[in-house]
């Protein structure tokens, strides 16, 4: 089964949102103790930090995680979290990851997300995996 992989700081905003989804998820550790590897396709849920300043918007833990070949290979999409106070840099980390790794930015939500965000993300994830599996089947035909 495909999973979500997410990073959440000690504020736990992203963690609380992911828990509301009731979808299997793995958390990128706050402290890089050892290499964290994913061995199946996943969607990354990533918050933006440092007021959306481009150089530091992607948490270093996420950068380290994506520098591992397996983790980079299995990344299929990204969901961004942020604060609308960042203005044009709202969810900028999601945009950065999407462009750098050439995966779709599937959704953006603010802070803890709303109930509507939870429903939209769950439905969007289901549609995304179905579409991805259909494309894969067509390529193998």
Swiss-Prot record:
SUPFAM superfamilies: Flavoproteins. Pfam families: Flavodoxin_NdrI. One of its GO terms (biological process) is protein modification process. GO terms for molecular function: FMN binding. HAMAP family: NrdI (MF_00128). Belongs to the NrdI family. Probably involved in ribonucleotide reductase function. PANTHER family: PROTEIN NRDI. This is Protein NrdI. It comes from Wigglesworthia glossinidia brevipalpis. The lineage of its organism: Bacteria, Pseudomonadati, Pseudomonadota, Gammaproteobacteria, Enterobacterales.
């Amino acid at each position: 089964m495909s999973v979500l992989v997410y990073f959440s700081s000690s504020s736990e905003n992203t963690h609380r949102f992911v828990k509301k989804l009731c979808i299997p998820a793995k958390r990128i550790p706050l402290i890089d103790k050892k290499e964290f590897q994913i061995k199946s396709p996943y969607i990354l849920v990533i918050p933006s930090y440092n007021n959306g300043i481009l150089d530091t918007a992607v948490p270093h833990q996420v950068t380290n995680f994506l520098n591992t070949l397996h983790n980079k290979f299995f990344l299929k999409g990204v969901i961004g979290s942020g604060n609308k106070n960042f203005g044009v840099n709202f969810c900028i980390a999601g945009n950065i990851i999407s462009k750098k790794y050439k995966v779709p930015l599937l959704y953006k939500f603010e802070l803890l997300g709303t109930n509507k965000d939870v429903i939209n993300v769950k439905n969007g994830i289901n549609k995304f995996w179905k579409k991805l599996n259909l494309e894969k089947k067509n390529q193998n035909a």
